[in-house]
A protein has these predicted regions:
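Conserved class I S-adenosyl-L-methionine
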Residues: 82-91
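A short SAM/SAH-binding and catalytic strip from SAM-dependent methyltransferases
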Residues: 145-157
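Conserved SAM-binding motif I beta-strand of class I
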Residues: 105-110
């Protein structure tokens, strides 16, 4: 059988060896945007057509990634990255590809770059943009760039370690794409360093699955927020930060829990 054409193949195409899913093939078949008239972003097209379909988000994640970047979010990252981007946890490099198409110098890293079989989300997938092997230890060598972290894992410490190491090495700009405190991306310490958790929830409220954030300084100040196209039940967004060179201490105890923890 003839292999389905990948969505957007005539605008820059699929990774080598990848065929289109049924959802992609449908979106390509009735895509009203003439070739060459709009920036290449097949995930945005797929999201518009696939909302509400069973398994659509899971298929989109496996091929592209967790976040659905729109023009506003891409414009924010471009504007926030005058010296280029270093992306950590880049997955299949879809967002890196979109930024590179817009003229941004992007260096993308992942601890287990696809198609590595040890990558639990993207095993066997060819990347859209070159993704190098690397963890939070590489960011200290890229401080002139903007650090980009998209949907970091909630049950690991590397996201917090990365934003802390980048700050201490002199990095000045950060873009985070994901959910807020209590959401499904980034642990409590990560969000505390970004100023999103005013008090240690583990010690103050006895939240059993919370990470102790006592003494965690606020290293980053949020400057801008852009809403993203969201899958049903998810609340991710793009946030731009600048480094605080006199880190603020944790704030006073809030009167109630500011959020409830959600499942991935």
């Amino acid at each position: 059988d003839e292999r389905r054409r990948c969505l957007g193949a005539d605008r820059g195409g699929c990774p080598p060896g990848r065929s289109a899913s049924p959802l992609e093939a449908e979106a390509e078949a009735d895509d009203p945007v003439p070739v060459g008239r709009a920036p290449w972003n097949p995930l945005l097209d797929l999201h518009r057509r696939a909302q509400g379909r069973a398994g659509a988000r899971e298929q989109a994640i496996a091929r592209y990634g967790f976040a659905v970047p729109n023009d506003e979010a891409l414009d924010l990252i471009v504007a926030w990255s005058p010296e280029g981007v270093v992306e950590l946890g880049a997955g299949v490099g879809y967002l890196a590809r979109l930024l590179a198409d817009r003229g941004v110098d992007v260096v993308a890293y992942d601890k287990d770059p696809p198609p590595s079989a040890t990558n639990r989300w993207f095993a066997g997938r060819e990347p859209w943009h070159p993704v190098l092997p690397g963890d939070e230890g590489v960011v200290g060598e890229q401080t002139q760039r903007t650090l980009l972290i998209v949907w970091p894992t909630r049950d690991e410490t590397w996201p917090a370690d990365a934003v802390e190491a980048f700050h201490h090495a002199g990095g000045g700009r950060l873009v985070y794409v994901g959910e807020g405190p209590g959401g499904r991306s980034g642990d409590d310490r990560f969000h505390a360093l970004l100023g999103g958790i005013p008090r240690c929830l583990a010690c103050t409220y006895g939240v059993a699955d919370a990470v102790c954030t006592c003494g965690a300084p606020v290293l980053w100040r949020r400057e801008r927020t852009v809403e993203l196209p969201q899958w049903h039940g998810y609340t991710d967004r793009a946030e731009a930060y600048t480094a605080t060179r006199q880190p603020a201490p944790a704030g006073r105890r809030p009167s109630r829990l500011p959020w409830r923890r959600r499942r991935l």
